[in-house]
UniProtKB/Swiss-Prot annotation:
It is found in: Cell inner membrane. The keyword Transmembrane helix applies. It holds the Pfam family MscL. Gene3D superfamilies: Large-conductance mechanosensitive channel, MscL, domain 1 (1.10.1200.120). Its main location: membrane. The chain crosses the membrane at residues 19-39, 40-60, 81-101. The lineage of its organism: Bacteria, Pseudomonadati, Pseudomonadota, Alphaproteobacteria, Hyphomicrobiales. This is Large-conductance mechanosensitive channel. It is a multi-pass membrane protein. It comes from Bradyrhizobium sp. (strain ORS 278). Homopentamer. SUPFAM superfamilies: Gated mechanosensitive channel (SSF81330). It comes from the Bacteria. One of its GO terms (molecular function) is mechanosensitive monoatomic ion channel activity.
């Protein structure tokens, strides 16, 4: 049973999937940092120093806090600022994946478009061609 599991785990598709999941997780952390630490502060500076991560609508009358963390402790809130940040994060990931797949498709098309060299004629065909050429000369 251990041998069968080892064979299954070492198949190309399983290993490729594992590598993809690990790289995807690392890429997700990079994109999250890009959105939260670079893009959203720039957008906040353009819009007058607004911090989108703290935007919320209180859904309970007991919520009086001005920041999201305290507001969540006081009651139900609709944290639309966090949603905007995560939505931007999603679109960046989707765009990067689109560009990667687009590049891979272009490479595939180039490889498919390259015409294959015609196969070398067999020895019989070469011999018959020589005979034909000699008969034409005679």
């Amino acid at each position: 049973m251990l041998k069968e599991f080892r064979e299954f785990a070492m198949k190309g598709n399983v290993v490729d999937l594992a590598v993809g999941v690990i790289i995807g997780g690392a890429f997700g952390a990079i994109v999250t940092s890009l959105v939260g630490d670079i893009i959203m502060p720039i957008i906040g500076a353009i819009t007058g120093g607004l911090d989108f991560s703290n935007y919320f609508i209180p859904l309970a009358k007991s919520v009086t806090a001005t920041n999201l963390a305290d507001a969540k402790k006081q009651g139900a809130v609709l944290a639309y600022g966090s949603f905007l940040t995560l939505t931007l994060n999603f679109f960046i990931v989707a765009f990067v994946l689109f560009m990667v797949i687009r590049g891979m498709n272009k490479l595939k098309r180039r490889q498919e478009a390259a015409p294959a060299a015609p196969p070398k004629p067999s020895a019989e065909v070469e011999l018959l061609t020589e005979i034909r050429d000699l008969l034409k000369k005679a």
